[in-house]
Swiss-Prot record:
Source taxonomy: Eukaryota, Metazoa, Chordata, Craniata, Vertebrata
UniProt KW Nucleus keyword: yes
Compartment(s): Nucleus, Nucleolus
Protein name: Protein MAK16 homolog B
Alphabetical keyword list: Nucleus
Length: 304
């Protein structure tokens, strides 16, 4: 059996307790189940067999209750009840569960619950509110950073000026090859040229695709002027043959001699490779014409 007075005489009255903290004015208790935090007979969780308190775990409040019936079972000594987040409903739960407890414990439980809810609300406000964080900086560091910023601006301006100058020289053709200069500017220019050439090639391909379906009429290159002239000469000869039927055989012989001379002339010229002067002599086709004469009407005339 548990005797509360005996426990208090051993622990509280000027005796040793591991949870006790002595000061010049008052003694405090470090036990987590202590309802007030003070070391006295009414608030001691060890010397009271019927006891209750409020604890907070991860933003949730719980009501812990201890009775003398569970004193022989340390693992099941405390009964825990979860309280509602609504303040009024939580107070009603405390009154319902602590009907037969002393009035002092009931009042202190309500007081402890109000304090816990207040600091939980304060924590939520602080987490939502933005706070300024002051970081001390020495003057030397500020001066150093300003100098670095100024140097960086000057270097950036110089780099831009050098890049423009190099691009102008490259466009003018001052450099035959790329030397040990900053290569980034040249790379940018080359990329732009490649993009321009790629766009031109794509335009040409599009034009070819557009013109692929068109139809055109083209002259025949195989037909030469000499062939056309030969056809014209044939027509002329045909016409002249109809007109010159009564011509004599002497004309045939003279034409044959002229043809032989013309055949010999190119053979003599072909021996050397001298350039030809004037117009080329076109060869005419050799044509043999046979004439038939009728003598019967003349004989009839003589007979008459």
């Amino acid at each position: 059996m548990q005797h509360d007075d005996v426990i208090w005489d051993v622990v509280g009255n000027k005796q040793f307790c591991s949870f006790k903290i002595k000061t010049k004015t008052q003694n405090f208790c470090r036990n987590e189940f202590n309802i007030t935090g003070l070391c006295n007979r009414s608030a001691c969780p060890l010397a009271n067999s019927q006891y209750a308190t409020i604890k907070e775990e991860k933003g949730i409040c719980y009501l812990y209750m201890k009775t003398i019936e569970r004193a022989a079972f340390p693992a099941r000594m405390w009964e825990r009840v979860r309280l509602s987040k609504n303040y009024e409903q939580a107070l009603e739960q405390i009154d319902e569960n602590l009907i037969y407890w002393p009035r002092f414990i009931r009042h202190k439980c309500k007081q402890r619950f109000t304090k816990i809810t207040q600091y939980l609300i304060r924590i939520r406000k602080l987490t939502l509110k933005r706070q300024r964080k002051l970081v001390p900086l020495s003057r030397k560091v500020e001066r150093r950073e300003k100098r670095r910023e100024e140097k960086a601006l000057v270097a950036a301006q110089l780099d831009n000026a050098i890049e423009k100058e190099l691009l102008e020289r490259l466009k003018q053709g001052a450099y035959g090859d790329i030397y040990n200069f900053p290569i980034q500017a040249f790379d940018k220019a080359l990329e732009q040229q490649d993009e321009a050439s790629a766009s031109e090639s794509s335009d040409e391909e599009e034009e070819d695709d557009e013109e692929s379906g068109k139809r055109e009429f083209v002259e025949d290159d195989d037909v030469e002027e000499s062939d056309l002239s030969d056809f014209e000469d044939m027509d002329k000869l045909g016409a002249s043959s109809d007109e010159d039927k009564p011509s004599s055989e002497s004309e045939e012989e003279s034409s044959g001699e002229e043809d032989e001379k013309e055949e010999k002339a190119p053979k003599a010229k072909s021996k050397g490779k001298a350039p030809l002067k004037g117009h080329l002599i076109r060869k005419r086709p050799h044509v043999e014409i046979e004439y038939e004469q009728e003598t019967e009407p003349q004989q009839k005339a003589k007979v008459t």
